[in-house]
Amino acid sequence: KAGMFGACSLCLGNKLVAWAEDVYTPESLKGINQGFPVKEAMHYKKLEDLRVECELCPRKCTIADMERGYCGVRENRGGSYYTLVHSRVCALNVDPVEKKPMFHFLPGTKAYSLATAGCNVECKFCQNWQISQYRPEQVESILLTPEDVVKDAKISGSKTIAYTYSEPVVFYEYMFDTAQLGNKHGLKSVMISNGYIQEKPLRELCQHLSAVKIDLKSFTEKFYQETCTGELKPVLNTLTTLKKVGMWFEIVMLVIPTLNDSEKEFREMCGWIKENLGPDVPIHFTRFHPTYKIKNLPPTPVKTLEMARNVALDTGLHFPYVGNVPGHEGENTYCPHCKNIVIRRAGFSILENHLKDNKCKDCDQPIPGIWA
């Protein structure tokens, strides 16, 4: 069955793994995905009566023996908590890093991109719901250890390992181990996340990451609660923590007609970003296309994305972008001082790069990012 990569959703050598697109019955699960190792989780505490409390994400699930947390990929076995998705990869591809999107991070390079099943929120507009909203036994996967990932990433010519497609927070231990090993072999790691994570595990993970992309899905609690089964405040806490630890990060907002597309919301969000994160954080306003549980709304009008970008510029943010509109001038990076184009893009391709020693070649204005 076709997945997000066209003919298949995971190709590794002569191995082919496709996403599950049907709801499996318990009977149909028998014999699927057997033999994957489990690993004890890193962030939880033991309670009475063999219960545990997960301390990874803001949900702080309390889990009885032989039950799982909200994410569906972490299980209590006899009073100890285990991840079921360590090295259990269900989606894999080599992408341009611009696809993440990361525009101020090693432009023009490749990212070895992988995912396991599971997520800790349920966004009604999720484009990768076939893996994010399924349990690991419902999605065909292959065993790919951190050692395998590092080896294959280097063979592919990738500079970076990207944890993406589903939600990396729920495969935290796998990401942690792989990023740690990758660093030893000269590979950077980036987390493409919803930002729904507690501060302690985030700080520990940041020691092994080079960059993070956070989806700021809206700037209202109402949207998060009704459309994502989550909360806004923990995501804002994640962003401020990333700022405090000195992590390079970029923000993406998927703009959905009638749900999070008001000028008022854009102004409030951009004002908060400037005040709490600074003017140099890139923000990508990306175009929505109908999918999953929101198929009744049209694609985002380009003029709405342009309005959002103009609001960001008016607020004083230096690097707002228009996303999912290939060829739009809002894909380019402009020098905030002289206003000339520093990097010209078309989709995921770099057409021109006028950086010189990480500065605008025309006026020597430093352009923040990780460029080498």
Name each region found by the language model.
Residues 143-301, 308:
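Conserved AdoMet/S-adenosylmethionine-binding subsite of the radical SAM
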